[in-house]
Curated annotation (Swiss-Prot):
A single GO BP: pyridoxine biosynthetic process
Cofactor note: Binds 1 divalent metal cation per subunit. Can use ions such as Zn(2+), Mg(2+) or Co(2+).
Pfam (any one): PdxA
Pathway: Cofactor biosynthesis; pyridoxine 5'-phosphate biosynthesis; pyridoxine 5'-phosphate from D-erythrose 4-phosphate: step 4/5
GO CC terms in record: cytoplasm
Other observations noted: The active site is located at the dimer interface.
Function: Catalyzes the NAD(P)-dependent oxidation of 4-(phosphooxy)-L-threonine (HTP) into 2-amino-3-oxo-4-(phosphooxy)butyric acid which spontaneously decarboxylates to form 3-amino-2-oxopropyl phosphate (AHAP).
Name of the molecule in the record: Putative 4-hydroxythreonine-4-phosphate dehydrogenase 2
Alphabetic keyword roster: Cobalt, Cytoplasm, Magnesium, Metal-binding, NAD, NADP, Oxidoreductase, Plasmid, Pyridoxine biosynthesis, Zinc
Cofactor: Zn(2+); Mg(2+); Co(2+)
Assembly and oligomerization: Homodimer.
InterPro entries documented for this protein: PdxA_fam (IPR005255)
Amino acid sequence: MTTSGADGTKERRPVIALAMGDPAGISPELTARLLALSDIRDAAHIIAIGDRRILDEGARVAGVTLDLEAASLDALDNAGTARHVFVDLAHLDPADVVRGEATLAGGTFATRNFRTALELAHAGKADAVCFTPFNKKAMRFAYPGYDDEIRFVADVLSFTGKVREFNVLEKVWNARVTSHIPLKDVASHLSVEAILAELKLTQACLKDAGYEEAKIAVAGLNPHAGDGGSFGMEEIDIIEPAVEKARALGFNVEGPFPADTVFLRALKEGFNAVMTMYHDQGQIAMKIIGFDKGVTMMGGLPFPLCTPAHGTAYDIAGKGIADIGATREAILLAARMAKKKRALSAAA
């Protein structure tokens, strides 16, 4: 399926493999709502993956009617059709769903859908992957050796490169040097090399999203960014040298700034991204700024991979009140990045 570009030429919509997430949360409702949106049909061709019975229950909860083309995995290609496609793996009886609880059945359902979506993109049958929220505890029930999605993705794709999570809002991105580790271990994981590597990956991902001259603000680790060494030396010994090396490479990067005001500065002064030193240093700010619009993007992969930044919301599952905003933004970001990657590949 093609759409008209700005110059009147025809261009193919990006094909996005969308994996249904945890069936016990709001994922079925979000998936159904998303597939019914007209602007999503204009932006991307979606191959949704899951169990049709679970999706139909989500549509009932959401109060939407779906017009989907059924397809098998063997029959898919990357051309895209007028209607979104649903691949029914038929692997979970709705009677086995315990709404509002993390279970082995829910974890198995979500991870199988996710694996299938990744394999489609890896095989060139999709330009990007998105997934609605699933629960890490349920994932560990199904795959005990995995703490988060990143290791799972790397193993499915046999990918050995660097993969990092970015949190994305329309006006600002958040990158982080460390992620899912105890707070007491953060300082020992910081180095000039680690920060510089994250800045390089952030710059590359921002370019894929259309930011040719990205402006990045770097947060300090300690209160008041160390206040000249009064509250810690990491800014002087590690963060400042990393920023200087990045600037020498031509990056438009500034900092370190105090973490309690760096996002205010970024929004006021037009920074495209803020790099924080640890997980919650950025997550708290991003979710206050735009919880219902936030997207998590896994950078460094051969294709865009996006999901809403919120979780499964077990407490409101089945009530028909889930906000589609972040899921919609995840699809739109994946579509934009897929188009940009395609354009860069064509120009190479």
